[in-house]
Amino acid sequence: MNGKLYALSTGPGAPDLITVRAARILGSLDILYAPAGRKGGDSLALSIVRDYLGEQTEVRCCHFPMSADGAEKEAVWNEVAAALTAEVEAGKQVGFITLGDAMLFSTWIFLLQRIGCPEWLEIVPGVTSFAAIAARAKMPLAIERQSLAVISCTAPEAEIAQALQQHDSLVLMKVYGRFARIKALLAQAGLLECALMMSEATLPGEQCWRHLHEVNDDRPLPYFSTILVNKQWEYAE
């Protein structure tokens, strides 16, 4: 059998939100690469997919540093991309799992840049965190002619402020460590009442805040925290 690499999206966190296709592929893999935020640490993505793995699957956890050291991250991306390619060339069925959707703000994208687009690569999409949040909070992402923007809160304040003015509905990702700044921008735009924040959507620790003005600026938030804004939606308590 020819080797193949699958980039498998795990969805937002609940194991039963994995796609049927991803679950089927997970059960057939020879090798699964699972990212971990720190050396020797647990992999959230692996905990999501573990029950779908076949007995034959060898799991390899790989550490992707969260530091600002560009050279360190480049070295890891190069190493993992080379390892994935070598396994495929050896005829293995290989998977790499990533939270949410593989093509949205994911570590996988940096590997894709190095691997390219060979015929032996398949990318399996998944439920995004903000799609899950919208469903859990019963808040539509966009209605009729509304524009929808997905913004990383790592962007400059001026760009975020401009997006808040230009778009009808927004997803503000990577809120962790930046909540006070984002809350202030929402207040300046008069949008606090149009926004909600959810952390760890679909996971056991899920939390939702519908009144952001009541959330202290220095409140500790989980890493997976996202804000949704819809200027034309009123939530019925």
Swiss-Prot record:
Which pathway does the UniProt entry assign to this protein?
Answer: Cofactor biosynthesis; adenosylcobalamin biosynthesis; cob(II)yrinate a,c-diamide from sirohydrochlorin (anaerobic route): step 2/10
Q: Which UniProt keywords apply?
A: Cobalamin biosynthesis, Methyltransferase, S-adenosyl-L-methionine, Transferase
Mention any Pfam family matching this sequence: TP_methylase
GO molecular function list? cobalt-factor II C20-methyltransferase activity; precorrin-2 C20-methyltransferase activity
Annotated catalysed reactions: Co-precorrin-2 + S-adenosyl-L-methionine = Co-precorrin-3 + S-adenosyl-L-homocysteine + H(+)
Keyword Disulfide bond attributed: no
Q: What class of enzyme is it?
A: transferase
Mind telling me which Gene3D superfamilies this protein's record contains?
Cobalt-precorrin-4 Transmethylase, Domain 1, Methyltransferase, Cobalt-precorrin-4 Transmethylase, Domain 2
Is this entry keyworded Transit peptide? Answer: no
Q: What's its EC? A: 2.1.1.151
Q: One biological process GO term for this chain?
A: methylation
Annotated signal sequence range? none
* Assembly mode: Homodimer.
The record's similarity note reads: Belongs to the precorrin methyltransferase family.
**Protein name as catalogued:** Cobalt-precorrin-2 C(20)-methyltransferase
